[in-house]
Amino acid sequence: VDVGVGVVFGLVGYRYERVGILMHEEHLEAALGVGPHTISVPSICPADDIDTDDFSNAVPDEIFEKIVAVIRIAVPYTGMIISTRESQKTREHVLQLGISQISGGSRTSVGGYTEPVRDDSSAQFDVSDTRTLDEVVNWLMKMGFIPSFCTACYRAGRTGDRFMSLLKSGQIVNCCQPNALMTLKEYLEDYASPETKEIGESLIAKEIRKVPNEKVRERAIQYLEELKEGKRDFRF
């Protein structure tokens, strides 16, 4: 069993929804021994036929930030997701409070990724943070975060109870840290702007030394060199 949970905050009272998420997490742990892989915290936002002023339960930014902090404290092992529904300012604040997964360069309309520019009249919701992926990656690194494109656990079948055991023992760091740096390296080599690549190379050189397991660290350094030479798809 491997699940993600979440609600759209603002449809009903946020206290009910917040407690509901935590009770759901508690039930999953008790019944299955496996909590949520991720918790998503979107909030009601403008769209073609939606005005947030019509929703009396819409959540102000300061309350939204408290919701993120409470969930992070209560479920320290889960990945917490925020989308481009939220503004750059809000996303920056909640990254400091517990968000670990964000989107960048998102399109919410049908077929939105097929053309560089297209009519967004079919968009599911309005995007508040309209920066490109490169701009988001650059921004994250300037704040000291490691942008990771890793999907190694899913690809290796490291989900459910296998994933939880790594998380709760803290050993996941010996997978996540090098995988994050290697996938960032791939992005820098293949897609990044010159400025983003320069910042990223400096970040990788600093962070690779922090991988706790010596054998993993040495192998990751070797893989990073091979990525520079054009090889791809290394993972722990």
For the regions a protein language model found, what residue spans apply to each?
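Radical SAM enzyme core and accessory elements
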Residues: 92, 97-100, 106-236
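Short amphipathic alpha-helical interaction segments
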Residues: 59, 82, 86, 124-128, ...
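Conserved C-terminal portion of the radical SAM core fold
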Residues: 1-50, 60-89, 96, 101, ...
